[in-house]
């Protein structure tokens, strides 16, 4: 998904966890992953798919979450993970990306 939607490839990946956004009526789950060592490339969007790709600092993201500009659950939970990893409260198990 990272490469397809943003064009970026990652040198390393870490799986943070999984969330079930609507357990009362769905089996949907969302995996939260972190990537580092990013390298830009060409996007491969599906037909009719559109995304705005931009960069922001961790501080900007956390501020947007705090101020209510970010309201979707998956981003808020990812930001919670980010905040805890950056503070040293939680750790991630980084793995080298598979070779293509």
Where are these regions (language model features)?
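Unchanged
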Residues: 1-73, 92-100
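C-terminal boundary of histidine-terminating zinc-finger modules
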Residues: 79
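Short helix-capping/linker segments at secondary-structure and domain boundaries
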Residues: 82-95
């Amino acid at each position: 998904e990272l490469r397809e939607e943003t064009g970026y490839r990652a040198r390393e990946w870490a799986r943070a966890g999984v969330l079930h956004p609507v357990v009362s009526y769905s089996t949907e789950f969302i995996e939260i992953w972190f990537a580092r060592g990013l390298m830009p490339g060409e996007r491969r969007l599906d037909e009719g798919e559109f995304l705005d790709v931009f960069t922001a600092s961790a501080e900007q993201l956390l501020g947007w979450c705090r101020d209510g500009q970010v309201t979707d659950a998956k981003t808020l939970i990812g930001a919670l993970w980010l905040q805890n990893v950056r503070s040293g409260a939680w750790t991630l198990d980084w793995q080298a990306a598979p070779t293509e």
